[in-house]
Amino acid sequence: MKILKSLVLLVLFMAMPAKADDAFSWMSTSFGGLKSLFGCLEVPEFTSFQEGNIGISLSTAGIWQSTGNTVQKGKLLKINWSTSGITLEPRKYLVLYRIDPRFSMPQVFIKTYNYSKLQFEALGFPRFVTDNNSETPGTIPPDKDLDALSFTKMSDFVKYFNYSNGNSRIEVKAGDVVNISLVGKDNFFSPNTLKLPNTVDNILTQELDSSIFAASALYTQSNLGDFDNRIIYSSAEQVCNMIDKERKSVCSGTGTATKYKNTDNGVIVGKPMITGAVQYFMGLIKACPANAGINTSPACYYDQGRGMIIKVGGQVIKGQDQSFVNSGSTQSSFIYYQATSGGIMDFTSDWQVSNMFSNSVLMNDWSRNFSNYASFVDYINKNDWSANFLYFGCYSMIVEIGNGANLINPDDQQNIKLEYLITSDGTLPDPSVRGMPVDYNFATDAPQDGYLWLRVVNPNSNIQGVVSVNYANYTGTTWFSDIIYNGAIKPITDQFRTFSQNFYIKLVKNSAVQNLAKTALTLYVTIFGLMFVTGALKLTAVEVITRICKIAIVAFLIREESWSFFNTYFFSAFTDGIDFFVTNVVGATSSRSNIFGFIDPIFDKYTNGRIWGLLFIELLQIHNGLAFIAIITIYSLITYFRAILEVIIGYVIAFIGVTVMISLAPFFIILMLFEKTKSLFDNWISTLLSYVVQPTILLIFFLLIDQVLSEQLLKVVVRACWDTLIPIKIGLDLTNLGIPIHFSFTLPFLPGIPFYVPDVPEISSSNILTNNANTFLVLFTTALLFYSYCLMSYSLVTFVNIVVGMLTNVTPARISGNYQERSDPVGAVMQDIDSVTKPIKKAAMAPARVFKDKIIDQNYKARKAEVGGEFTNKFLAERNDVKKEEGEKKE
């Protein structure tokens, strides 16, 4: 009775408690109001692990990110992370496309973005020797003549623009997405292109221009003033008709013989006009119409990329007359292209710059024809540089190339590190605080209680994206595994490890064993020599190596360092192999250091107070059969707990078997020398292997069944709501006595005994075939399935013994018996446990039998025996309605 009261109190405590101010308000609540007060008991979810995930952006590298999880000391902390969301940063280039009459093709200045330095750099650009000791480091020394310096570098300039000096070009791969946008000329020399200190001698950190005219120097200005990204291609006649129609200042001649004259020879470096003339001329002309050809009349300018051809691997992606797409929202012009094949990106034009002047103006010719600076200056000053047509201008572009499908470089991936940190409070840790490194599949026991923090460190600057991190920590109890492993199993295994080592060392040091080994070696070598001399043995390389190895192993066996050698390179594979396989097979565990930590989540599930409370509620439903389902479930759980005990015992027996076999290793190792005794050595190896494989296979089957059991248990247990458990109805019926009196009534203050009632609908024609998880039919079939799976787990040891025997060919049999059954040490241990607990089981079942006899069957008067009299022998242990002879037969 006390147990029953305790269970009722347990169920009531599981209900939602009332507020402190309303602790006694239920006393004045009506019977119907109690239902809303106590509510329902829901089926619990098995949440022994607190899981979560977080995406950490590489842009926040080095900064600690909160997971929101709290961990407990000594319990499992598991972290898995992936770099699948990491991609390469788009390759960025600044490109200056400029028309210069001294080069047969347009000049293309390329600057590559360096993510490490966060700046654009002109790689391979021919640079001058600069004076870093001056007040403005990086400038040309004032005592040097720019023109004289540039004359000696003309060949370098030619090589640079012809890409013959190894300078980098823009490479596009198949599948790359290319975006080219027009930008202002100032972007090419943007602030993120640092001048100091990283690019001290990189003269492309500022405009290439000089107040002194130098025909052999490079320039980046096209003398269009504020009119960026425009190209002029017009005959001298069209230009002169606008700016010097009377041919009085900068023009001469008429018709096709018209020439444009320039007093400072700036035209030969792409600067045909002074600033004032440019402003005047650009104010007179307009943009050329769409699809306008070369040398349009009247003179006009080309914009939006017209006049420039862009190719990738020889394939044109933007034609001469094609314009960039104008974005109305961003007011920018761009071209978007996905490469179908790879190659080098070229910026070129079909418009020819040759014949602009009557004399040779190509820098390539100058570098070959002039050996000294004086003759070159004389050539420039004496010749007439009047232009037959004007072709000048520039485009400034930014090129971005990316491909989400491209894998990041292995070096970049290896540089990405993840760290975790546990703090006692939720305050954001300082970035200078170092954390613990985390592998891709990381598991450990939390070193302390606290909050979990994660961060990414050391990513390379050329990658971007998010590191995806999944984390989980165990929140359940660990008392069972602590008792089983730390309190029982670990002391046993440690003792047997020590026993195995001591026994082995004593055996090896024993003079009889040493003499046996020496005698065996002597016989082996003698027999081998005689067989070889008489020709009875065909000697091969494999045979020689095999025999030498055998001799070396046995010879090393009797040395003092025998245990250290064999334990390190051989025995540890078996002693540590069991723990290794068990640890790697187990998925969910409470502790990394406790190999039986996987039992804690299982016990958390099957010892959950809510589960047993709902089962007790079902036990009270005798009238509708739910009590039978609850009894099946409880008995199944007890059977399953026994199966868990078998797994534990199986592990211990396997480990003991391994240590015993290892302690006898010297005998079996000696036996491998001779063919007649080698079978004993082979069987010894097979036995060791079987002891390692058996607990592993047993655990695999056990965990698979546990997954199914968890699902079935949640279907057997149903929610329970506060309702009338036993209705109280008072009535009187005298019609059977001929008195016409028949009435019944309920007490308004107590219509029934209230308690939790399972929420299960009655079986009807409408739901008998539906897949409703709460129908009696579904509950009954699920309970039978649950019972079947528990019985299956109970029989796993026998089944695994058969499987391991077939795999390792180790099938020890009894000496006698028709079938020579395989011995089962685990089964023998369980039978001993049964025999010890049998009286307890009988004592527990006796009240149940009495309850069935007196309450359910209403057998108040026991049946009489055939000889007369009432049989009442062993009232609490035997049924009174069964004859003594029948009872003995059943036993």
From Swiss-Prot:
Q: Which GO terms describe its biological process?
A: protein secretion by the type IV secretion system
* Membrane protein topology class: Multi-pass membrane protein
Indicate whether rRNA-binding appears among the record's keywords: no
InterPro entries recorded for this chain? Answer: Conjugal_tfr_TrbL/VirB6
Highest taxon, organism lineage:
Bacteria
Record's Gene Ontology CC terms? Answer: plasma membrane
Which compartments does it reside in?
Answer: Cell membrane
Q: Which UniProt keywords apply?
A: Cell membrane, Membrane, Signal, Transmembrane, Transmembrane helix
> Where does the chain cross the membrane?
525-545, 568-588, 614-634, 652-672, 685-705, 776-796
Signal peptide positions on this chain: 1-20
The entry assigns this protein to a family as follows: Belongs to the TrbL/VirB6 family.
Q: What is this protein called?
A: Uncharacterized protein RC0145
